[in-house]
Curated annotation (Swiss-Prot):
<keyword id="KW-0658">Purine biosynthesis</keyword>
<comment type="similarity">
    <text>Belongs to the GARS family.</text>
</comment>
<keyword id="KW-0547">Nucleotide-binding</keyword>
<dbReference type="InterPro" id="IPR020560">
    <property type="entry name" value="PRibGlycinamide_synth_C-dom"/>
</dbReference>
<keyword id="KW-0460">Magnesium</keyword>
<dbReference type="GO" id="GO:0009113">
    <property type="term" value="P:purine nucleobase biosynthetic process"/>
</dbReference>
<keyword id="KW-0067">ATP-binding</keyword>
<feature type="binding site">
    <location>
        <position position="283"/>
    </location>
    <ligand>
        <name>Mg(2+)</name>
    </ligand>
</feature>
<dbReference type="InterPro" id="IPR011054">
    <property type="entry name" value="Rudment_hybrid_motif"/>
</dbReference>
<dbReference type="Pfam" id="PF02844">
    <property type="entry name" value="GARS_N"/>
</dbReference>
<dbReference type="InterPro" id="IPR020561">
    <property type="entry name" value="PRibGlycinamid_synth_ATP-grasp"/>
</dbReference>
<keyword id="KW-0464">Manganese</keyword>
<dbReference type="InterPro" id="IPR020562">
    <property type="entry name" value="PRibGlycinamide_synth_N"/>
</dbReference>
<feature type="domain" description="ATP-grasp">
    <location>
        <begin position="108"/>
        <end position="311"/>
    </location>
</feature>
<comment type="pathway">
    <text>Purine metabolism; IMP biosynthesis via de novo pathway; N(1)-(5-phospho-D-ribosyl)glycinamide from 5-phospho-alpha-D-ribose 1-diphosphate: step 2/2.</text>
</comment>
<dbReference type="InterPro" id="IPR013815">
    <property type="entry name" value="ATP_grasp_subdomain_1"/>
</dbReference>
<feature type="binding site">
    <location>
        <position position="281"/>
    </location>
    <ligand>
        <name>Mg(2+)</name>
    </ligand>
</feature>
Length: 421
């Protein structure tokens, strides 16, 4: 298969690595890519990922058998629709189905129709009076959850015990032109479960846990994700199946009923409380950085699997096979991420096999430099969670990037038995 991957981050690097080991893969291309992907795929840097016409033209030019879309923005922009209209197999949902991430209000409506457990929510639209906003905020708390009802790269959510901070985020989102969703706070540890979905066929991958806050001990602002690990030693034995049965299958069924059948990767962000799983959010694509850990453990050929989803034959595939191990991702972020990341700093000692590229580029001198907030990912795999952590942190400590930072506590709470249900 000739495969084109759309995106430019470490998630796409992980997808390319997985696809490259599948004997069914004959050619790999990526657009727009980054500075670390040239050794594994042909990079097409001039292509805008969210331009349906440009992506479709490239796929036709390359005679692609399969296009795999990594990020959410191209999906919400209708890139998958354009590819399908051109007769090209694509892994990723159509624009209508991508609303499961693009509109939190739409996701709430889908869940309500199927009785899926989630937080109570209330929308505030641009133009609402100050008095109405205050009244809505007073109906929630004392821990406020304020969400930008649009795409925010994982950084549009504020969870705070401070009413003034909650109001400030409401105002900021409304001033940006998007509605706001206020939600009740869901207690319990979070689970990221990726499911391959082909209509009403749902196949779960390994459960993972993301670390959203910028700094150790879950301090600092929300980010796109600073690290993740898989699987979850603290999740009940029936945990994955409960999420599939109580969340993902009902949602897939509802999408079919609404005429926007889902085809691609459905990411369920779950809070596991006293009554079991409740939905925090849905994403319409592989999560970043959880994907990097999950795919490191997948033994089943990835190209064949994604193509089965794209061609409507997922139900015919054999059960997935996994390594009996743990995997962990640690993100190396640039100076002042996530507020105003500095770019252009030279990166050294990043040549290890377990390093994935995200925000990287080459400068005029041909040096590897930072080109985004999340710059590199380091993957650790081991028979135990402790061994996986050791492998990742041994590598990341040697990488040089001025002003960079990373969390030193990825999976530490799980390792020390501090997560309980």
């Amino acid at each position: 298969m000739r495969i084109l991957v759309i995106g430019s981050g470490a998630r796409e690097h992980a997808l390319l690595r997985g696809l490259s080991t599948d004997p069914a893969t004959t050619e790999l291309h990526v657009a727009p890519g980054n500075a670390g992907l040239g050794s594994i795929a042909t990079v097409h840097p001039g292509i805008k990922a969210d331009d349906p016409e440009a992506v479709t033209a490239l796929a036709k030019e390359l005679n692609s058998d399969l296009v795999v879309i990594g990020p959410e923005i191209p999906l919400v922009a209708g890139v998958a629709d354009a590819l399908r209209a051109a007769g090209i197999a694509v892994f990723g949902p159509n624009k209508d189905a991508a609303r499961i991430e693009g509109s939190k209000a739409f996701a709430k409506d889908v869940m309500a129709a199927q009785g899926v457990r989630t937080a109570h929510a209330e929308a505030i639209t641009p133009g609402a009076s100050s008095e109405d906003i205050d009244a809505a905020i007073d109906r929630f708390g004392p821990t406020w959850v304020v969400k930008d009802d649009g795409l925010a790269a994982g950084k549009g959510v504020v969870v705070t015990p401070d009413r003034a901070a909650a109001r400030a985020h409401v105002d900021a989102v409304l001033e940006g032109g998007n509605p706001v969703l206020l939600e009740s706070f869901l207690d319990g540890p979070e689970v990221s479960l990726f499911c391959l979905v082909d209509g009403e066929t749902v196949v779960p991958l390994l459960p993972a846990q993301d670390h959203k806050r910028a700094y150790d001990n879950d301090e600092g602002p929300n980010t796109g994700g600073m690290g993740a690990y898989a699987p979850l030693p603290w999740l009940p034995e029936d945990g994955v199946q409960r999420i599939v049965d109580e969340v993902c299958v009902p949602v897939a069924r509802e999408m079919v009923a609404r005429g926007c059948a889902y085809s691609g990767l459905l990411y369920a962000g779950i809070a596991w409380g006293a009554e079991g799983p409740a939905v925090v959010e849905f994403n319409c694509r592989f999560g970043d950085p959880e994907t990097q850990a999950v795919l490191a453990l997948l033994k089943t050929p990835l190209a064949v699997l994604l193509n089965a989803v794209a061609t409507g034959t997922l139900a015919e595939q054999p059960a997935l096979e996994w390594e009996d191990a743990y995997a962990l991702t640690v993100v190396l972020a640039s100076y002042n991420y996530p507020e105003a990341p500095r770019t252009g700093d030279v990166i050294r000692n990043a040549d290890a096999d377990n390093v994935l590229h995200a925000g990287t580029a080459l400068n005029a001198e041909g040096e590897l430099v930072s080109a985004g907030g999340r710059v590199l990912n380091v993957i650790g795999v081991g028979e135990t969670l402790e061994a996986a952590r050791d492998n990742a942190y041994t590598t990341i400590k040697d990488i040089e990037l001025e002003g960079s930072h990373y969390r030193s506590d990825i999976a530490l709470a799980a390792l020390e038995g501090r997560i309980s249900i």
